[in-house]
Structure formats: C-alpha cells, structure tokens
Design a protein with these regions (language model features):
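Domain-level recognition of nuclease-like catalytic cores that cleave nucleotide substrates
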Residues: 289-321
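Active-site proximal loops enriched in glycine and acidic residues that flank catalytic Cys/His/Asp
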Residues: 168, 268, 304-306
C-alpha cells in the first residue's frame, strides 16, 4: 500500500490526479502539491518470484523487467533513442542474457530521464523474496552475484536516479547483499525514522472511527488490531485491517494467509530450522492468525535469529519450540 501510494503521488502517469490526495495532510503544503505527478517512476515487485532454481528465478525477474519495457514502448517513437539504444530496447525479453538483464533497469532509467528531462524514482517491493527462495533451495551464491550486479547498476552507478525505495521482510546484513551501496539507508521496525509512516497511528484510527460514526467501538478495535510497534512508537495499526473494518463495520480477521504447519520432526538440524523460519516469514504466517484458525499453540514455533552475512549468530539467536 505504501509503495503504491508513493508511486501515485510522484509518477507522471498520475499527473493531474491531485484529487487522490485532497483532504490529506500532505496536500496542505503547496510545495508538496507541486511535486505530485512530476517524476518518471519505475515501479516493480519481486513478491511473486518464488522459484525453485536459479535459472527460473532469473527468467521470472527478466519477465518482470520485460513488462516494464513493454509499458514504456512509446520511448521507441521518434529520435530520442539512438539506433543502438532501440536495438537494446527491443532485445529485452524473458530469455535475454544475464549481462543484458543486470543493466536493464539502469538503461530504462536513462531512457525515461532523457524523455522527461528529470531523474527517475525507482520503487522495488519485496526485493528479498527471490533471495529467501535461493537460500531455501540452495542457489544463494549464484543469485547473490546476479542481484548484486543488477542492484549496483540500478542504485549506485546510475546518474539518472533521483532516489529509490526498496522494501523487504528479512533482516540481512547490508554488506552481504549491498556491499557496493554505501549510500543506502536501512530503516527497520526498530528505527525511529518514519516510525509513524508504515501503519495507522492510534490517533488516526480513532479519528477515522469518529468520522464513520463508530467512536463507541474504539476499545473493540484497539483490542483486535493494535499490534505493531515501530521504533519507540507503540499502538500502530495494520492499515488493511482498519480499512476493511471501516468498510464492513464489523470485527474480522482481514490480514492472514493460508498456512501449512511443518512438523518439528522435519527439522533435523539448525539449517532446517532456519529454512523453516524463512519459509514461515515469507508466507507471512503469524501466530495470531494461526491460533485464530484453530492450530494448537504447541504446534506453533516462534523464531528469532540474528544474521551476519550468511552466518547465523547462534549466541544471539533463539528458537522457541
């Protein structure tokens, strides 16, 4: 939701769509109004890149990049691009060589920047989903090299980049994946910066309840949906749950996924346990939703690990079973 909102605020594809933000705090400042719809934006997600081999993973990433190029085929019109650049543009496909694929986002940035006369914003959602699958399925080293090459080209050696936002759900030492991105700022759930930006605050939720004539249900909503802490900011609510509650005006589990619980006997050593933990995180299996669906508490395991590169720091890790 956050990435979609950022795209719609900045993207030239949503120019003259300021009404989407009318009535919101950001629209009270003219300097922010003047930014709406003024940047070329490259938005992509790796959320569905869940392959079992290196070859199919790269092919899926190439497919996503190909769709980006197809969405911007207007760049081929006229004389903006040289014949060599047009040839490169047309070479983008699911089966393109890796050396072409790793430069594709960088070069699309250049083409868009030339067309609009402005640097681009890149939004990459769930950058780490392919890496989780690579670790679980044994092709981490291969994918790490490919990913580092692509990210270095897109996010470091890219003079056409205004700024970028990448989101992920696993905490990995920056030097393991982004050793070349020394200008990267890592924001986690323990960071104070932006602590109120990735969820609804209690004040916002209660104001919404009052606006919808549901102020008498504040305690009920708090007991169900007040479950997140970012930095030192407590009482952060899941936006999707609150939006659905306001729409349906009744309590319900609006944020969950189908879950398969792995038997503890299937975990023969620490490596199996770590893999199970990563799979659980990737599938968004949360304790509250598992209990809600009737899974016995004794079948649910809570994982806590600290990672340094590809090594697990045993002393800082706990496994509660």
């Amino acid at each position: 939701m956050t990435m979609s909102m950022v795209e719609k605020f900045f993207s030239v594809n949503y120019a003259q769509k300021g009404e989407l933000f009318e009535g919101l705090s950001i629209w009270k400042e003219e300097k922010y109004q003047n930014l709406q719809g003024t940047f070329p934006v490259i938005s992509l997600s790796f959320a569905n890149v869940k392959e079992k081999s290196y070859e199919t993973t790269v092919q899926r990433i190439c497919q996503i990049v190909t769709e980006l190029y197809n969405d911007n085929r207007f760049l081929l019109d006229g004389d903006l691009l040289s014949e060599e650049e047009k040839t490169y543009f047309r070479s983008i496909s699911m089966d393109m060589p890796e050396v072409v694929a790793t430069m594709a986002i960088h070069r699309l940035s250049k083409f868009l920047s030339q067309y609009y006369g402005k640097k681009v914003i890149i939004l990459l959602d769930e950058y780490d989903t392919p890496m989780q699958e690579a670790y679980v399925n044994g092709f981490w080293d291969e994918l790490e090299f490919f990913t580092r090459s692509m990210f270095n080209a897109a996010f470091k050696t890219n003079p056409y980049l205004e700024c970028a936002i990448m989101t992920g759900i696993t905490s990995v030492n920056r030097d393991a994946i982004f050793p070349d991105l020394n200008h990267l700022e890592v924001i986690t759930t323990t960071s104070e910066k932006y602590a109120e930006c990735f969820g609804f605050t209690e004040e916002e939720v209660f104001a919404s309840l009052e606006e919808y004539g549901l102020s008498e249900r504040k305690e009920e909503v708090k007991s169900w949906y007040d479950g997140f802490t970012f930095g030192s900011k407590t009482d952060i609510y899941n936006p999707w749950s609150i939006i659905n509650y306001l729409d349906k005006k009744k309590i319900g589990v609006y944020w969950f996924s189908e879950d398969k619980v792995q038997d503890r006997e299937d975990e023969k050593d620490l490596q199996d346990t770590v893999k199970a933990a990563l799979q659980q995180i990737n599938a968004k299996k949360y304790k509250a939703s598992l209990i809600e669906k009737g899974i016995p508490k004794e079948k649910i395991r809570t994982y806590g690990f600290a990672f340094q590169g590809k090594q697990v720091l045993i002393g800082n890790g706990t496994v509660i079973v």
